[in-house]
């Protein structure tokens, strides 16, 4: 997992009225929390810096951030995961951000997005792809957490499926999502019969 550095400022004023003032100054209020912290750290993030993280995929994939937090004349450094971003659905404006501070020596439980790759044989035959589980809960050291998990669907035919238990992940990653959860399956189209599919496959192989 790559590490990206971002600068923050510690804030003392908390509440909706102050949050609005901060946002008008292009500063997004946020909080840093974690099991090893004595107390939550309330912070401010430059709006442009937060948008840059989103554009780089940090809101959809897992990456370690190195938070450089200015606290007057002091500087606090924490490693963290971008846990949540609140965005106004109407104005598409940033409202708040949560950072989950982590120790690089302690395992964390995080959700990692699933990315389907390839084009299924079953879809080419007219089957319909159904995407089930879109995130997998795993336990690993922060630097061992992958940004996403790729699932190759190329060989899936109509009626086939891939479950969480079918994933082949490194030994240093423990999967916490139930093994029988379906990630993807190819369902038959309306009026589908195995005989028709077999005849179609034979025709394609002869052409």
UniProtKB/Swiss-Prot annotation:
Chain segments annotated as transmembrane: none
One Gene Ontology biological process: translation
Pfam families: Ribosomal_L25p (PF01386), Ribosomal_TL5_C (PF14693)
UniProt keyword annotations, A-Z: Ribonucleoprotein, Ribosomal protein, RNA-binding, rRNA-binding
GO cellular component: cytosolic large ribosomal subunit
Family indicated by similarity: Belongs to the bacterial ribosomal protein bL25 family. CTC subfamily.
Name of the featured protein: Large ribosomal subunit protein bL25
Subunit structure, as described in the record: Part of the 50S ribosomal subunit; part of the 5S rRNA/L5/L18/L25 subcomplex. Contacts the 5S rRNA. Binds to the 5S rRNA independently of L5 and L18.
GO molecular function annotation: 5S rRNA binding; structural constituent of ribosome
Organism: Dictyoglomus thermophilum (strain ATCC 35947 / DSM 3960 / H-6-12)
The protein's role, per its UniProt record: This is one of the proteins that binds to the 5S RNA in the ribosome where it forms part of the central protuberance.
InterPro entries: Rbsml_bL25/Gln-tRNA_synth_N, Ribosomal_bL25/Gln-tRNA_synth, Ribosomal_bL25_b-dom, Ribosomal_bL25_C, Ribosomal_bL25_long, Ribosomal_L25_dom, Ribosomal_uL5_bac-type
Ligase listed as a keyword: no
The keyword Transmembrane helix belongs to this UniProt entry's keyword annotation: no
